[in-house]
């Protein structure tokens, strides 16, 4: 029995990019096509089948532990970027500032799609697995602050639940600008004890 349900929610790819050296700068550089082998985009500093654990999983592993890399690709929505900009009092937030890999348009509340959802290129079959919501960090604030002094600190609150998701490659291939990604969701109910677990 299939465990994933194809939906009619579609995201159109409106921007692609890579961050080639995150030690040098957070910003990403635009691309027309992303090559996506199993380790993620070869040019991307976040690529690799494994990675060193960071603060996001500090309650699970000592920092620097080698773990599976479920953060190969960072994806945000055009709609969420517009809302972030609006709340910050800016005309626009450029995807480069966030160091993202991809911007999609057309999926509502994109940052909150279920973990383990798939984003599948309808034409090529290239498929990304959503790990979880990406959380806003101070590094983006610093990038914005350079261009808009006094504004950067507004990013974290404005980007709450709008920072997109991280994902990893399940089926290799390419995704190009203009591609259509179909959302496939786990066909299961929400765990009834989620609220209790969060408050525990």
Describe each region flagged by the PLM:
Residues 1-118, 122, 132, 192-198:
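Electropositive, beta-rich accessory/interaction domains or terminal extensions
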Residues 104-108, 112-171:
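Glycine-rich active-site loops that engage anionic ligands at enzyme catalytic sites
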Residues 113, 174-177, 181-183:
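Short, well-ordered loop/turn sites that connect or cap secondary structure elements
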Residues 124, 133, 180, 186-187:
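Short, surface-exposed secondary-structure boundary micro-motifs
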Residues 129, 138-140, 187-200:
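Short, Lys/Arg- and Gly-enriched loop/turn segments at beta-strand edges
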Residues 147, 154-155, 167, 180-185, ...:
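Acidic/glycine-rich phosphate/pyrophosphate-binding loops and surrounding catalytic core
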């Amino acid at each position: 029995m299939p465990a994933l349900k194809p939906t009619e929610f579609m995201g159109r790819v409106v921007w692609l990019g890579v961050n080639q050296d995150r030690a040098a700068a957070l910003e990403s550089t635009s691309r027309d096509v992303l090559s996506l082998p199993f380790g993620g985009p070869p040019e991307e500093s976040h690529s690799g089948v494994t990675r060193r654990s960071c603060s996001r999983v500090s309650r699970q592993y000592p920092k620097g532990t080698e773990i599976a890399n479920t953060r190969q690709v960072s994806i945000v929505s055009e709609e969420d970027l517009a809302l972030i900009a609006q709340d910050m009092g800016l005309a626009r937030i450029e995807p480069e500032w966030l160091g993202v890999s991809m911007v999609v348009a057309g999926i509502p509340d994109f940052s909150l799609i279920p973990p383990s959802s798939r984003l599948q290129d309808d034409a090529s079959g290239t498929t990304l697995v959503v790990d979880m919501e990406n959380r806003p960090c101070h590094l983006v604030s610093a990038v914005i602050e350079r261009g808009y002094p006094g504004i950067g600190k507004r990013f974290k609150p404005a980007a709450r639940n709008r920072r997109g998701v991280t994902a990893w490659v399940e089926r290799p291939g390419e995704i190009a600008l203009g591609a259509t990604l179909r959302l496939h969701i786990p066909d299961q109910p929400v765990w009834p004890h989620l609220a209790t677990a969060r408050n525990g």
